C-alpha cells in the first residue's frame, strides 16, 4: 500500500475523534451482465464499491459521477437509488447514499489512491470485500431494488 494515503487516513482519525463530524458519502454498484466492479484503495485492505465524499454545494448524483470519473475513469449512464445507510465507525456520523448503474464505460485511467480495479463475477466474489460493500451486494441480489434505509 502506498504510504502517503495511509498516513493521511491515520492522521484523520484523531480529528474525527475530537470533532465527531457528520459526513455524506456516495457509492455505486457498477453491474455489467453477471459482473460487478470493485476497487481496492492504497490505504485500505478490502475491496470496496467505488465512490467517495460529497463536496459542499454538490448534488448526490454529481458527487458519484465525479468520484468514479476521478478514481477509476468511469462515465456513468442512468442511475437508480438503492438506499441510504448510516455508519458510525471511526468516530464519524457517516451517511452513505448507494446507487446502481448498469450503463457505464471505463477509460482505463486510475487515481493514485486506487491500487486496483477489477470486474468480478458476482457468483465468484473475493473473500476480502468490506463488510458494508458485501451487504449492499447481497441486498441487491435478493430484493426488488426499491430504495432502503439502514445501517452500513
Question: What are these language model-derived features?
Answer:
Residues 54-77, 86-140, 148-151:
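Unchanged
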Residues 31-70:
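Conserved Nudix-box catalytic region and its N-terminal flanking loop in Nudix hydrolases
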Residues 20, 28, 39, 89, ...:
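Short secondary-structure boundary/capping segments
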Residues 1-27:
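Acidic, metal-coordinating catalytic segment for phosphate/diphosphate chemistry
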Residues 27-29, 35-37, 96-100:
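Residues embedded in well-ordered beta-strands
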